[in-house]
A protein has these predicted regions:
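C-terminal helix-rich "cap/oligomerization" subdomain common to oxidoreductases
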Residues: 1, 8, 68-70, 106, ...
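Hydrophobic residues in well-ordered beta-strands that form the structural core
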Residues: 15, 54, 71, 94, ...
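Beta-loop-alpha module in the N-terminal Rossmann-like domain of NAD(P)-dependent dehydrogenases
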Residues: 39, 48-111
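Glycine-centered short loops/turns at secondary-structure junctions
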Residues: 89, 116, 141, 250, ...
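Rossmann-fold dehydrogenase core element
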Residues: 107-124, 144-148
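C-terminal glycine/acidic-rich active-site capping loop/insertion
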Residues: 206, 210-249, 270, 276-354
């Protein structure tokens, strides 16, 4: 197999996890990292074990050894960087959101199709083996027809008024904060696991902390601490949301997202209730799958390759009792993306494990629709 060269644009919180995941594949070279200056690019390249460091993404795109561009920049740069990479004929792995707006995301869908390259979005919770087990169980009909889905995605890293991130700045993060950042994950997970599509939403959003102390220095997401030098800024985006949803089979659903919920570090939960049984997966207990019954004892299926169905077994790499985690799921997604790249042109379609640009566009559209609904006083809004 020919070696594939990877280049990373954006080395903040999630960027190093991209590098770690593709390095584990064994057939990918970490060629380059782009920073905002030559000095920062070189420093980040050395820290991540890349061969080259560049002071701009444009310089990285000019490197013929870079075949795949990983876009882990702040949201406002997603469209610009991805569009430029596609124009150079590079494969692209983009963090979500695909773009700041659904209109931009749709343009990227079209640009990727014209480029004829592999283009994926990192909805990484698809990569968990128990998520794939849930998808298999539901597709087999073990739950019966789903009629209700509910859940949440709760965090507490923005609970204090001294907590700040670029995600709270609409010019960098976009028109949504909590919904775009984590609510999009819940929606993708619900649709991926069930095969259903969200068709209508009704949103109620709130900004709990309306003024925050913005450090004059930079700070990554989830980074604690305060700064003596701050600027008090008005917050215009939501940090809490409650959403009702309807699916294309007539099922109903509801979910809540919030980043001001004390004690919830990364609490993503989805439950699917069907005509025969129910099923629940929770990210903070991600090696288990709860299955609920009416006429017999409920079950908790622990992650064990010998107990999983074929559709999930290949994504569990350790024996039962050996826990797998967030980074392992991320690597599973990257493995499927790079298998398609390694296959060569004409490149095969991405498998369900890996989210497409079309999936990314749909995620943008759902978030936009929830914001539209909330602005309209909580009216049902079609996707």
């Amino acid at each position: 197999m020919n070696r594939i060269g990877m280049g990373l644009v954006g080395a903040g919180f999630v960027g190093p996890h991209h590098v770690d995941a593709v390095r584990r594949l064994g057939f990918v070279d970490i060629v380059a990292v782009a920073g905002s200056t030559d000095e920062s690019g070189q420093s980040k390249a050395e820290a991540l074990g890349a061969r080259k460091g560049y002071g701009s993404y444009q310089a990285l795109l000019d490197d013929p050894d870079v075949h795949v561009v990983h876009n882990a920049t702040p949201n406002h740069l997603h469209y610009e960087v991805t569009s430029a990479a596609l124009a150079r004929g590079k494969h692209v792995v983009s963090d979500k959101p695909l773009a700041m707006t659904a209109a931009q995301a749709k343009r990227l869908v079209n640009e990727a199709q014209r480029a004829g390259v592999v283009a994926a979005v990192t909805f990484n919770y698809r990569g968990n083996p128990m998520v794939q087990q849930a998808r298999t169980v539901i597709a087999r009909g073990d739950l019966g027809t789903p009629h209700f889905l509910y859940g949440h995605y709760l965090q507490d890293w923005l609970l204090k008024d001294t907590d700040y991130s670029w995600r709270l700045d609409p010019e960098k993060g976009g028109p949504s904060s909590a919904l775009g950042d984590i609510g999009s994950h819940w929606c993708d997970l619900a649709q991926h696991v069930t095969g259903l599509r969200i068709t209508h939403v009704l949103g109620d959003i709130a900004t709990v902390i309306k003024k925050r102390k913005k450090p004059l220095g930079s700070r990554d997401a989830f980074q604690a601490g305060t700064s003596d030098e701050v600027d008090v800024v008005d917050i215009k985006v939501e940090d809490l949301a409650c959403v009702l949803v309807r699916f294309d089979n007539g099922a109903r659903g509801s979910f809540s997202v919030g980043q001001v919920c004390g004690g919830h570090k990364n609490d993503l939960m989805l439950e699917v209730c069907g005509a025969k049984a129910s099923l629940r997966w929770r990210q903070e207990a991600q090696n288990e799958l709860w299955i609920g019954h009416r006429d017999k004892a409920n079950e908790v299926l622990a992650k064990d390759p010998s107990l999983l169905d074929a559709g999930a077994r290949g994504y569990a790499h350790l024996p039962g009792g050996h826990q797998e985690a967030w980074a392992d799921a991320f690597c599973n997604v990257m493995r499927e993306i790079y298998r398609c790249i390694a296959a060569g042109p004409p490149y095969p379609a991405l498998p369900p494990m890996a989210a497409t640009f079309e999936d990314g566009f749909r995620a943008n559209r759902i978030v936009d629709a929830i914001l539209e609904s909330a602005a309209d006083g909580g009216a049902w809004t079609r996707i």
